[in-house]
A protein has these predicted regions:
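Solvent-exposed, polar/charged alpha-helical surfaces in well-ordered, non-transmembrane soluble domains
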Residues: 1-4, 8, 50, 54, ...
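Hydrophobic, aromatic-enriched interface-forming segments
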Residues: 2, 20-24
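A short helix->loop->beta-strand "cap" motif at the edges of active sites that frequently abuts
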Residues: 10-14
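Mobile gating loops/cap/lid regions near enzyme active sites that modulate substrate access
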Residues: 22, 34-37, 69, 74-104
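Histidine-centered active-site loop/cap adjacent to the catalytic His
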Residues: 93-130
């Protein structure tokens, strides 16, 4: 595992492990590619992300890693409604009313990546204080 290798080469290093954000609830999960399987829908992707984050958090708490690994919970700080790519679309052919629809529910927008960076930076600063 890469964590073991880093710790072996740099035994005094602290390692921050960043979780992943939840998918966009406004759609867009499969708009950019042809996904199939349990992860191609919003619910399936959300459950997968939650399980993956739980795995990372529990890994960091193991006796083997707890002294030098810290899990950073991005999902708690990421705005899933407004930090993915979206476009405004008419709600139907007879109405001029528009709604925001996700066009990529997996990869954040530039603002979303900046928000992830901000959360990582805050967690990293806090980790280095201790």
């Amino acid at each position: 595992m890469i964590i073991d290798r880093i710790h072996s080469d740099f035994p005094n290093a602290k390692i921050g492990i960043l979780g992943i954000q939840l998918p966009c609830p406004n759609g867009g999960i499969t708009s950019c590619y042809g996904a199939s399987g349990y992860y191609h829908d919003w619910y399936g992707e959300t459950v997968t992300a939650l399980n993956y984050n739980k795995f990372l958090e529990e890994k960091c708490k193991l006796d083997k890693y707890k002294d030098y690994c810290k899990y950073f919970d991005t999902k708690a700080q990421f705005d899933v409604e407004y930090n993915y790519w979206t476009k405004d679309m008419k709600v139907n052919n007879r109405s001029e009313v528009v709604e925001r629809i996700g066009i990529n529910g997996i990869h954040p927008s530039l603002d979303g990546y900046n928000q992830i960076g901000d959360s990582f930076y805050r967690a990293l600063v806090e980790m280095l204080k201790h």
